Each structure stands twice: as C-alpha cells, then as structure tokens.
Amino acid sequence: MEAHDAHVNSEESENPGAAPYGNFINYYTFNPPENRLSLIPEALLQNIGFTSGDGERVLMLDVGCNSGDLSVALYKHLLNKEACTSDSPRQELYMLGFDLDQDLILRAQTSNPFPQNIQFIPLDITDDTESRAVLQAFLGKFGCSRFHLSTCFAVTMWVHLNHGDAAFLSLLSRLASHSEYLLLEAQPWKCYRSAARRLRKLGRSDFDHFKALKIRGDMAAHAREHLEKQCSMELVQCFGNTSWDRSLLLFRRQ
C-alpha cells in the first residue's frame, strides 16, 4: 500500500501472506468493508459540517485503497445509498483513492461504478515530491487547499516496517497537511509481529527496519500524540474497534 512498483506475482497469488507492502490481492475476502462501515456513521459528513446535496463539493482521499472495494462501499455509505448504481443522480462528493500496486489499481479502475465521482490512481505515499504534486493537482481542480476528509485504513504499519520510524511520522504529518479531517486506523503492534512472522515462514528476509524500530507498543497512541503535538490536529471521536481490534480515530484540524 505504500512503496515500490509491487506488482502481484505468482507467489503472492498462491500465498497472500507474501505481500510485504500490504498489497494483498484478496484483502476484502478476509476483511470485508462492513468491518469498518459498521462503525462509521452514515451521517459522518453531515456530523462534521459537510454536505453533498446542496451544491457544496466535498473532497475525500482514501490512502492505500487496494482494489477499491472499501472506497466504493464507503462512498455509498456516506451518501446513504445502499442501492446506489452508476445511473444514480450525481452527488457533489468526489473521492481520490490511491495505492502503490498498479495491478490492484487497475482492478479498482475496471470495477469502479462511479468514474465521474471516484478516481483511482497508482501512487507511492512515501514519495513526498510526487505524492504532494499529485494531490495538490487534484485539489486544484476543485479550488481547494485540502481534502475535507481523508481516510487511512491499515497503511501505517507497512510504511513503518518498510521505511522506519521517520517515515511513519512523516506519513502522519503528510496526511495532516492535506486534510481537514482524518479518519485513521493504525495497526496495533501485534500486527507488526504477525507480519514479520509470515515473512520468516516463507523463508524471506525480515523487514528492513523491524528490529530497529524505536516507536513500538500502543501504535494508535503514538499516532495520536504526533498528530496532536506536531500536526495541529485533535482527536474528536473514536468510533470503536473493528473485529480485528483496531480503533477508528477521527481527527480534526485545529
């Protein structure tokens, strides 16, 4: 979900645990969108002061969107359109989803039921120069300086494991700089150990930074501390924990 041109290969097709960047090819079969949507209010946009039916354009960003299943489901969820189809009236809600894996993005683009409102692109969030340029270009089309709501589900660990402590904090800072509100799901530390164990079982070398990481323990608390102390954001609500025991935290720019 955040590095390299990580195309899906035959080994990853046979063993999804071999996706060291989180780019699982069958992710939503074992963690379906409902696991998160059941915790997120349908009226979230209205609750935070944004609407999509009165001419106001609302911009959303989904970081590490994989094959787009959750992105599309969340789009429909927030518009209260369970039976939403491509023929439904266009709403003023626009979403940009990206992932590092071009094969997953191609699947997202091919299956996208709302191409006029949802755009999927390949992008590496750890490439600061490129990601900043691409996101600012998208925002510029709408005359906005930030996304009204950004979502980052289960991405932080992969950036952290593959790029280290500094990249973990930089990711949070970058998301904060582009967002009015940020909905964050940070993987807990036990997931780090599980990811490393999967690689070892496959006979692969360990994550480059795993043993050297100094930021450990309560990862949601570490993320919150950085966002509040370094990024001028504040925690406004916790929507509870998913079935995988991961908290969904909503932050607001102060």
From Swiss-Prot:
Q: Which Pfam families match?
A: Bin3
One GO cellular component term of this record is: cytoplasm
> What is the name of the protein in this document?
Pre-miRNA 5'-monophosphate methyltransferase
Q: Keywords, A to Z?
A: Cytoplasm, Methyltransferase, S-adenosyl-L-methionine, Transferase
Occurrences of domain Bin3-type SAM (ranges):
34-254
Q: Which PANTHER family match?
A: BICOID-INTERACTING PROTEIN RELATED (PTHR12315), RNA 5'-MONOPHOSPHATE METHYLTRANSFERASE (PTHR12315:SF1)
Which PROSITE patterns does this one have? BIN3_SAM (PS51515)
